[in-house]
């Protein structure tokens, strides 16, 4: 089964390039650990009306991997550098409904 985890929050830095650099460094550090736990994709989005509003959509092949990764203090420390406050994290499971 396929799972999606969304992470939505306000970026800490007002400078978008600084936020991107922090995000990309986080992915470089945490990405290999996530992939080893079943993370098969990561996409980052910014709200076009407020580019400090961030949304990540991560695709997983299991539910245990993201739960374990999100509980890791290393990821918490990275989130503290990236976000102004705690981001909202939501878990979704693929439905066996028609999709395209």
Predicted segments, located by residue:
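Short S/T/G/P-rich N-terminal loop/turn motif that feeds into the first structured element of a domain
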Residues: 1-71, 81, 85-100
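Active-site phosphate/pyrophosphate- and oxyanion-stabilizing loops and adjacent acidic/basic residues
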Residues: 77
């Amino acid at each position: 089964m396929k799972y999606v985890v969304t992470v939505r929050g306000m970026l800490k830095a007002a400078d978008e390039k600084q936020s991107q650099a922090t995000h990309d460094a986080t992915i470089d550090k945490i990405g290999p650990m996530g992939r080893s736990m079943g993370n098969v994709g990561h996409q980052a989005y910014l709200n076009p009306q407020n580019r400090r509003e961030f949304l990540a959509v991560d695709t997983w092949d299991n539910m245990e991997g993201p739960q374990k990764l999100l509980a890791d203090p290393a990821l918490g420390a990275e989130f503290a550098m990236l976000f102004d406050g705690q981001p909202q994290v939501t878990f979704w499971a693929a439905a066996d409904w028609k999709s395209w």
